[in-house]
Amino acid sequence: MLKDKTAYRVAVVGATGAVGAEMIEILEERKFPVEALFPLASARSAGGTVLFQGQDVIVEELTNDSFKGIDIALFSAGADVSRQYAPIAAKAGAVVIDNSSAWRMDKDVPLVVPEVNPHDVEHHQNIIANPNCSTIQMVVALKPLHDRVRIKRIVVTTFQAVSGTGKDAMDELMDECRDLLSFRAAEPKVYPYQIAFNCLPHIDDFLPSGYTKEEMKMVNETRKIMGDASIQVTATTVRVPVYVGHSEAVNIETEHKITANEARALLSIAPGVILYDDPEHKIYPMPLDVAGQDEVYVGRIREDESIPNGLNLWVVADNLRKGAATNAVQIAELLVR
């Protein structure tokens, strides 16, 4: 049992990627009791080093034998890698916390946001799923309201940073900005169109319904995490030329009336939330405010005047941290408490 130990052997799969690097940094920041760190990556990245607790740790190639003696394995290397290696790690005795979409909707795999449904961790069978970045920040902001007045319907539009796609996308935005400001044509490779000075209403593949996979992740994951399949959710997800920090315009319809001031009072004491809402003094959350932060920032709270029980919110968070790496490490903390 993990709780019987005082320090843990932790593997990070995808250790050289944007989220994997954040996971390693956050393990150290939050003083997670690591006995030994095992950074794992593809053969191409193996042999390099990552810095942990002042020491250079060699990145090893991910293989079927990588999980012997591992207590906790943090995965952030994409769904294909997770489908292949997470069962191997789980069978070897490690508890897998997976940041990909591979296991999120599996009925036997808990999908956990510690501020929302920490109790679901107890039902794991050695694999726990980390939700989609845009889902995480939204449910952290909405759970206190749902508990008070029950949310019937959610309409959300996201404005998602390029770091959600990965390092190559961040480089592409920088290269395109440089080229365009030098009067050279942009040459997109990661995205189907230029992302610099542009917005793309297209994240992940399109489905026959006209929605994207990203949009349906928000629909299905929200219901599972909140434990309420009756919540109606519709989403539009947009990629924007921002490096770090996802923003969301969220509209909710509730079963019972809640005023903007009542919502502010609830959110001001909600775990993991920072209320940042004083429009009169131009105070509202922006991606620049949240970069490097672990909390979900909420502002622009106002009643929806078009329906009796409606509320609008603006929700912003660091997608690499709370939207991925921090949430994963918080799940690990739940396991060892």
Q: PLM features: what roles do these ranges have?
A:
Residues 1-195, 230-232, 282, 296-297, ...:
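N-terminal Rossmann-like NAD(P) cofactor-binding subdomain of oxidoreductases
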Residues 73, 162-337:
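Charged docking surfaces used in two-component/phosphorelay signaling
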